[in-house]
Each structure stands twice: as structure tokens, then as C-alpha cells.
């Protein structure tokens, strides 16, 4: 499973989560205010798409200008990125799988084998938005696109940027610390996270950032998974 990111990106994400989601202006009075997403739409070749109507001028990815993460945009048409595809959590690399690899090819999908590792390889081979190092987001990263202003049943995403989305459960790369057979997912019907078995079949939304993802064991500024 490919894993990349950057300390600067994580610092941006920390500010993104701790300040705007809760209050309007850190240090000001605690006034509830909906979070405003700032994203740029991208075409398959990575160029900027200046359209806002997905039906007339569809885009393939979005760049979050606050976290510096790029996200894939799911599609309703059949194929590799179809919104209904599901995948089991699978990572055979003992250095990154949290102690248990999960289960290979246990989802229902088209375009690749139906597990997280296979999907990542297929998207990177496609060079989605001109990129070939997409990876499964961490629990922390996936939280940055949860739209807390959207009520159940969701989907709790900024629809202006993710127009074709389902309110399902989406995998993260984060193994549950005390149960290696489990991994964290974000549920986009309720906008909450929970732990499920790696053998289950759920959705995927890959992300990308230019630099290396920090290792909690080696980088002192990054805390290890909290649960």
C-alpha cells in the first residue's frame, strides 16, 4: 500500500480541523460558523477545470487548497471509479499494515481486483490527474473532507466538489491499535468514524500529496495513532 504525505500538509490539516470546524477565527468569540471548503477542480491531465457544473464540464479530482491534499472524484458510470464499487482492506507489507494484512479481493467492483492494494495500483497505472502515487488516506486526512453541516443520511461531503458520491463507509489506512484485524473508516452518512473488520467490503477515496507521509515513530512532530 503506497503511503505518502508531508509534515507541512499535516500542520495545515491540524489547523484545518482544530480551528475552522469549531469556531469563526481562533482567538475570537466562540461563534458557531459552517466550515467553508476551498478546492480547485482538476482534469484528468492535472490541469485546472474552471467549470462548476459537473454535468456540462466534469472534473476528475479536486485539490484542497487548505490541506494541500488532492482527492479523486468518483463517477456514476461503470468502471474502475464507479461510486458503487467496494473493496476489502488489504496491505501485505508488514511495515505498513499494522500487524495484519487484511483480506485480498473480497469486495464487489469492476476494473481491478476488489481490495485496497489492487485499487491503488490500478489508479496509479491510470495516472489519474497526471499522478502516479495515489494512496489510501489516513484517518486524520479523510476527516478533512467531512462536511459537518450535512445532516444524516448525507453524504457528508462538499457536494459542489464531489457531485457523484454515496453516503457510505470509506476506508482509511489506519489499523486499530488494539485490534490488528480492524481498521478505521469514515462513515459519510453520519460524518463519524468507527472501526470495522479489514475483511469487510467498503468504498475507497484515494488522495495524493507531493512529499513523504511522516512516520510517527521517526518524526517527533507527528503523534502516533491515538486509539
Describe these PLM feature segments.
Residues 21-135, 139-227:
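Glycine-aromatic-enriched surface loops/turns that form tight recognition elements
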Amino acid at each position: 500500500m503506497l503511503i505518502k504525505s508531508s509534515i507541512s500538509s499535516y500542520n495545515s490539516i491540524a489547523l484545518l480541523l482544530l480551528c475552522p470546524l469549531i469556531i469563526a477565527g481562533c482567538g475570537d468569540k466562540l461563534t458557531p460558523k459552517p466550515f467553508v471548503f476551498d478546492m480547485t477542480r482538476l482534469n484528468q491531465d492535472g490541469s485546472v477545470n474552471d467549470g462548476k457544473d459537473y454535468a456540462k464540464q466534469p472534473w476528475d479530482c479536486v485539490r484542497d487548497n487548505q490541506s494541500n491534499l488532492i482527492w479523486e472524484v468518483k463517477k456514476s458510470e461503470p468502471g474502475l471509479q464507479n461510486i458503487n464499487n467496494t473493496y476489502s482492506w488489504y496491505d501485505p507489507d508488514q511495515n505498513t499494515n499494522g500487524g495484519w494484512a487484511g483480506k485480498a479481493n473480497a469486495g464487489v467492483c469492476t476494473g481491478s481486483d476488489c481490495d485496497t492494494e489492487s485499487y491503488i495500483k490500478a489508479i496509479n497505472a491510470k495516472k489519474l490527474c497526471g499522478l502516479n502515487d495515489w494512496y489510501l488516506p489516513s484517518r486524520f486526512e479523510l476527516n478533512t473532507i467531512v462536511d459537518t453541516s450535512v445532516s444524516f443520511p448525507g453524504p457528508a461531503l462538499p457536494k459542489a466538489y464531489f457531485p457523484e458520491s454515496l453516503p457510505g463507509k470509506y476506508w482509511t489506512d489506519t489499523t486499530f491499535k488494539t485490534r490488528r484485524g480492524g481498521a478505521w473508516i469514515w462513515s459519510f452518512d453520519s460524518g463519524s468514524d468507527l472501526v470495522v473488520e479489514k475483511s469487510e467490503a467498503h468504498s475507497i477515496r484515494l488522495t495524493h500529496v507531493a512529499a513523504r507521509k511522516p512516520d510517527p515513530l521517526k518524526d517527533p512532530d507527528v503523534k502516533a495513532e491515538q486509539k
